[in-house]
Amino acid sequence: EKGDGNMKLIFAIVSNDDSSRVSKELTKNRFSVTRLATTGGFLMAGNTTFLIGTDDDKVDEVISIIGKHSKKRTQMVPSSASYGVGMYTSFPVEVQVGGATIFVTNIERFEKL
């Protein structure tokens, strides 16, 4: 099976907390997805990166599904500060987590063997 030049590859990085819902909804809407386990750099939290190949005219639908099922939320994470030589204290900091980071690229060639 070969694709024409009007296909896109969507990379969607989603929190593990949302990945099952996103995957289920994409599959229900007949999108083929590949899931990769990834780790974010800032919080070192587990993520799922979805690879989704689709026709150009379906990109907005994919992004809408991902957005609907990957919600932003706040979370308290430990942080530390120095208040003297060799003296540190730890305190919680509220950060925003979740949501999705999405990249859309052109596909030069697609073959399913």
Which stretches of residues belong to each language-model region?
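Positively charged, small/polar-rich N-terminal and surface patches that mediate targeting and assembly
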Residues: 2-113
